[in-house]
Design a protein with these regions (language model features):
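Short active-site neighborhood of thiol/selenol oxidoreductases, capturing the structured segment around
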Residues: 71-93, 98
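A short beta-strand-turn-helix
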Residues: 58-77
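Structural microenvironment flanking redox-active thiols in thiol-disulfide oxidoreductases
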Residues: 92-132, 143-146
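Thiol-/selenol-based redox modules, centered on thioredoxin-like
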Residues: 159-198
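N-terminal targeting signals for export/organelle localization
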Residues: 1-61
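Short loop/turn microsegments at loop-to-beta-strand junctions
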Residues: 55-56, 77, 161-163
Length: 198
C-alpha cells in the first residue's frame, strides 16, 4: 500500500492515477474478504467445538441466593446466556428482551438462565431494577465461564464474553451463539427452540 502511495506522487497523468486507485481498492477488498472469511471460520469452529457435546455441570447461586444446577433442568430446554456486566447498556437491553419473551420461553418448555461474573448482591440489584422473572447466576469464581472458555481480561478485571448456549432437554448443546445482537438475540433463541422442537 505504501508503494502505491509513493507511485501516485510520481504518477502525474489522470489515467495513471485511476489505475493506481483501482489497484488500491482491489487490495482493500481482498483484505476485507480475508477478514470476513476469518470471522466465519471462527464461528464454524466454535460450533464444531460445542455442538453435540454434553453441557458442563454447574452449581451456582442466583440473585436470591438460590442454588441452580444443570441436572435440575433435565427434560427442559436451557438458554444459558452469558453477559459481561450488570447494569451496562447492552446487558440491560439483552435482559429486557428475555424478560419480554419469557412467557413464550416457558410455553416452549424452556428455562432462561443469565450468567455473569458479578456477585449475588450485584445480581439482586440488577434483577430488582429490571423486574427480571428468571434467574441470573453469579459465576464470580469464573467456574462456569472458564469451562466454556469465555472469560475475557479487561484491564485489571475479568468479564464473561457475550455468548449463549442452547441446551436441549437431554443436556446436549445444540447451538452456540458467539455473535450476539442484544436487540434480537432473545427472539432468535426462542425461534431456534421452536425449530429444534419440531
Amino acid at each position: 500500500m505504501q508503494n502505491i502511495m509513493n507511485a501516485s506522487k510520481i504518477c502525474k497523468s489522470k489515467l495513471c492515477k485511476i489505475i493506481l486507485l483501482c489497484i488500491s481498492l482491489s487490495l482493500s477488498l481482498t483484505q476485507f474478504a480475508s477478514a470476513e472469511s476469518s470471522i466465519f471460520s471462527k464461528s464454524e469452529t466454535s460450533q464444531k467445538q460445542w455442538v453435540g457435546k454434553a453441557a458442563p455441570a454447574f452449581k451456582l447461586q442466583d440473585q436470591n441466593s438460590k442454588w441452580h444446577s444443570l441436572s435440575q433442568y433435565k427434560g427442559k430446554w436451557i438458554v444459558l446466556y452469558f453477559y459481561p456486566k450488570d447494569n451496562s447498556p447492552g446487558c440491560t437491553q439483552e435482559a429486557n428482551q428475555f424478560k419480554v419473551l419469557y412467557p413464550q420461553f416457558l410455553k416452549s418448555n424452556a428455562v432462561v438462565l443469565g450468567v455473569s461474573l458479578d456477585d449475588v448482591k450485584s445480581h439482586q440489584k440488577f434483577s430488582e431494577k429490571l423486574g427480571l422473572p428468571f434467574p441470573i447466576l453469579a459465576d464470580n469464581n469464573h467456574q462456569l465461564a472458564n469451562q466454556f472458555g469465555i472469560v475475557r481480561n479487561l484491564g485489571i478485571t475479568k468479564i464473561a464474553k457475550r455468548e449463549s448456549f442452547l441446551i436441549d432437554p437431554k443436556g446436549t448443546i445444540v447451538y452456540h451463539y458467539n455473535s450476539v445482537d442484544t436487540q434480537s438475540h432473545a427472539a432468535q433463541v426462542l425461534a431456534d427452540i421452536q425449530k429444534f422442537s419440531k
